[in-house]
């Protein structure tokens, strides 16, 4: 078991605060919007593991900082994020972190509410894996970093979006770099509520408080049964997707 004091200040890319059993996790880079890179790729799996081992938390709110949930948006189509072949040491680390990240998120045994405060350009599958997804009316959802950025969408995108959108819509979304507005995402069933930005966090805390008041065993067991099918999909397909992503990275000139 862990306690909040053991990990609250442990990570550079997130702030954590807990009140009345509700843990708010705010993603950031140097106090601004999260800029995806090797640091959050390494830290998020570890943080989710710590959170999952803290039984004093009754509900989790995941949100971002400022005007974006996660960036930066990749707009240089045709210029891959990894222009040269990474070392096997880097590949090995990416595989391990990639396998742990989403599974550790799903292993948090209390309900998670995502409060998507703005565009999720990078790893938009993460907030969509929450039990309740709220979005500011300025939010957008895109996979800007994978296929259109020169990477195989094999680290969870290939699982989450087909489950949520259906196979054909998801393949179009991933192959074209389509952007979904908050309103589009709501109409397609990805988002439960779209709110004005200044109401987003209040609504997230309202929902979390309602969950946290319920019996602990009820809360934890419900989270377990609602995520079991997602874990099974991850177990079946995440490893293969990650290896496909890394294999394609090897088809690059050496550094």
Which ranges hold each PLM region?
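Charged catalytic carboxylate motif
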Residues: 39-43, 97, 104, 203, ...
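Hydrophobic/aromatic residues within transmembrane alpha-helices
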Residues: 25, 62, 126-128, 185, ...
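CoA-thioester-processing core
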Residues: 101-107, 115, 120-174, 203
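Short, structured loop/turn "capping" segments at alpha-beta junctions
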Residues: 167-171, 180-187
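Glycine- (often His-adjacent) and acidic-residue-rich active-site loop
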Residues: 56, 64-100
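Short acidic-hydrophobic, aromatic-tinged amphipathic segments that line or gate anion-handling sites
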Residues: 134-135, 191-203
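Conserved CoA-thioester-binding segment of acyl-CoA-metabolizing enzymes
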Residues: 1-63
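C-terminal alpha-helix plus adjacent terminal tail
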Residues: 1-23, 29, 69-70, 76-81, ...
